């Protein structure tokens, strides 16, 4: 049945839940489910040539915004104020309410309520920090610099206490983020935040550099040949892989040197996700049967993927491209990361062009430079196809229409799409940005927060993600990316 249906109305009409993916569905563990998230064994190293060691340098690529940023709206300011008030005494942020996956005798079941412990965790803290950072506060300046410093110290301490071999950076388990988009999401998020704050941490810069080197080494070590990570299961693990890829790209822009195969694998995974190709790697962790959740009256135009879902494998999570059958997730992740990686490759391409022009360059140096330029051209060509597909898709009203239930996964996907569309700019970007601003403003709660209606429901993540979507025009991109692309070979 291809006719577009409003999310929950469609499910009601069909009389089934979890059969046709016409809307984002939750996959919350039923009471007494057999297993929750557990520590996964360390994956065996890939049988390949040794990886180039991670090296942190002091260099930074010149960056600027793709467009002139709008002044912070009252909606954004209200959301920022909410986040600041929710910071815990230890400097971190917790989920901000909502369910958790139980540990112990009832492992795997869903627990929630005012008596359920909600400790600060790395993942939610990182996303809150990123929102404050995008709004103009760093550890050394801005109206909320003290909050940023406290939050940064919180995540640095957790990374410092973490072992060096596994892909974990936290001992807090079974959060919504881990259950829904992957058990290693905390590591990927902290790598992203550290990469973005590199060079701006003030007195904490030395600790930040050491922590970034540690998280980068963990991720490089555990990335598999397909651009994913072993045992990174969940409802929609493509989204956590997307965060990992974005963190690699931002690290590269900010002076972190690492093996070029990491980017090649990540780029291949991104283009595959954009094309809707099946995800490779281990089977996803159990997440329970899919269940629809009744939306609140203020739910934002949910189910942007409603009419375009894959409609397969939704009961176990991780189906198709690891997107739970919701095309929004994989297309947003793939298109966003394709652009992310190209941003860094274009910087390399500009440097390579200079080598080719330099009469003093050796034959070997020119051969290597030409290889880089050729790789950039190939990446540009592939990215052009991906971005054209994305632009055409977001123009389709079915992709952003209907009123149903949005979870944190949708908010994150909106962000991925925003950061892809803004690089090219134009009508596709302005139309999308206007839709996001209007819809998110209507969905904001009176206290300034946003909450999810399915899957990731915690207010910290959803509020941070919504704010980042509305502040996408403040994202910094390499200056060379915003200039003319690499010139064709004559």
Enumerate the language-model features and the residues they cover.
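Bacterial N-terminal signal peptides
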Residues: 9-22
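Preference for long, amphipathic alpha-helical scaffolds in soluble/luminal domains
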Residues: 4-7, 24-490
């Amino acid at each position: 049945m291809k006719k577009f249906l409003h999310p929950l109305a469609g499910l009601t009409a069909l009389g089934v839940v979890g059969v046709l993916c016409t809307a984002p569905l939750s996959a919350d563990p039923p009471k007494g489910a057999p297993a929750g998230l557990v520590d996964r064994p360390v994956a065996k190293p890939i049988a390949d040539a040794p990886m180039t060691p991670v090296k942190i340098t002091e260099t930074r690529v010149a960056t600027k915004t793709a467009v002139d940023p709008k002044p912070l709206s009252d909606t954004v300011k209200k959301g920022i104020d909410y986040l600041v008030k929710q910071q815990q005494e230890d400097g971190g942020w917790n989920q901000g309410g909502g369910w958790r996956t139980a540990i112990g005798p009832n492992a795997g079941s869903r627990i929630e309520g005012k008596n359920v412990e909600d400790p600060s965790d790395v993942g939610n803290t990182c996303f809150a920090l990123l929102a404050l950072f995008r709004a103009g506060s760093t550890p050394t300046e801005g109206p909320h610099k003290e909050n940023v410093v406290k939050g940064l110290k919180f995540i640095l301490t957790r990374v410092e206490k973490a072992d060096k071999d596994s892909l974990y950076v936290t001992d807090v388990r079974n959060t919504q983020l881990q259950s829904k988009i992957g058990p290693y999401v905390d590591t990927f998020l902290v790598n992203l935040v550290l990469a973005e704050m590199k060079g701006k941490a003030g007195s904490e810069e030395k600790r930040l550099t050491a922590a970034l080197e540690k998280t980068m080494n963990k991720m490089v070590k555990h990335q598999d040949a397909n651009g994913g990570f072993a045992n990174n299961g969940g409802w929609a693990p493509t989204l956590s892989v997307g965060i990992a890829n974005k963190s690699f790209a931002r690290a590269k822009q900010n002076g972190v040197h690492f093996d070029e195969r990491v980017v090649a694998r990540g780029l291949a995974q991104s283009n595959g996700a954009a094309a809707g190709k099946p995800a490779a790697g281990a089977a996803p962790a159990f997440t329970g049967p899919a269940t629809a959740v009744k939306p609140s009256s203020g739910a934002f135009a949910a189910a942007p993927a409603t009419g375009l879902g894959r409609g397969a494998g939704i009961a176990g999570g991780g189906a198709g491209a690891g997107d739970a059958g919701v095309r929004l997730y994989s297309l947003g992740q793939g298109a966003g990361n394709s652009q992310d990686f190209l941003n860094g490759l274009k910087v390399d391409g500009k440097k390579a062009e200079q080598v080719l022009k330099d009469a003093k360059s050796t034959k070997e140096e020119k051969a290597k430079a030409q290889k880089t330029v050729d790789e950039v051209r190939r990446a540009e060509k592939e990215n052009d196809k991906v971005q054209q597909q994305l632009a055409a898709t977001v123009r389709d009203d079915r992709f952003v229409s209907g009123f149903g239930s949005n979870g944190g996964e949708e908010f994150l996907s909106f962000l991925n799409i925003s950061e892809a569309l803004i690089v090219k700019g134009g009508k596709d970007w302005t139309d999308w940005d206007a839709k996001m601003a209007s819809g998110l403003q209507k969905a904001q709660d009176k206290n300034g927060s946003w909450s999810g209606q399915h899957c990731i429901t915690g207010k910290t993540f959803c509020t941070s993600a919504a704010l980042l979507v509305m502040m996408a025009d403040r994202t910094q991109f390499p200056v060379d990316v915003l200039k003319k692309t690499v010139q064709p070979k004559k």
